[in-house]
Amino acid sequence: MGAQARRERLAQLVAPILAEAGLDLEGLDITPVGKRRLVRVVVDSDDGVDLERIGEVSQKISTALDEVDVMGQSPYVLEVTSPGVDRPLTEPRHWRRARGRLVHAPLVAGGQVKGRVIDADETGVTFDVDGQSQVYAFSDLGRGKVQVEFRHDDAAD
């Protein structure tokens, strides 16, 4: 079985497990690491993902992999994780999950926008830029990036 076919079969295998847990599949990679393969499944949800949910779906995915031959006879390591803060915002759901966060995004027409995400829907995102509300369609934005903040002025001390 080729790498692409294996990846597609694996995605089909994990999809119902993740759907049952209320999680979205954000990424799926199979990478050779020495004599083994690393199977990395990246999951997320609008509520975020805690370690307990990661552990539960990891166990279910592991059991499902043991029941089928999608990985063949080669040994593998399964890693189920959530996306890091450096994941680019490319889908409407990514922008929704960034509500309240400071985001920097290039504009397709040139320039950039840097502001706090107020709201996002299926068509675009609303930023607070220096106290002013600015709305952009997703088609006007490049890949957004959440800015790491160690202290937010509105945060409680």
Curated annotation (Swiss-Prot):
Keyword terms of this UniProt record: Cytoplasm, Ribosome biogenesis
Superkingdom as given in the UniProt entry: Bacteria
GO CC annotations, alphabetized: cytosol
Family matches, as InterPro entries: Ribosome_maturation_RimP, RimP_C, RimP_N, RimP_N_sf
GO biological process: ribosomal small subunit assembly; translation
Location of this chain's protein in the cell: Cytoplasm
UniProt xrefs under PANTHER family: RIBOSOME MATURATION FACTOR RIMP
Entry function: Required for maturation of 30S ribosomal subunits.
Family indicated by similarity: Belongs to the RimP family.
Name of this chain's protein: Ribosome maturation factor RimP
Organism: Thermobifida fusca (strain YX)
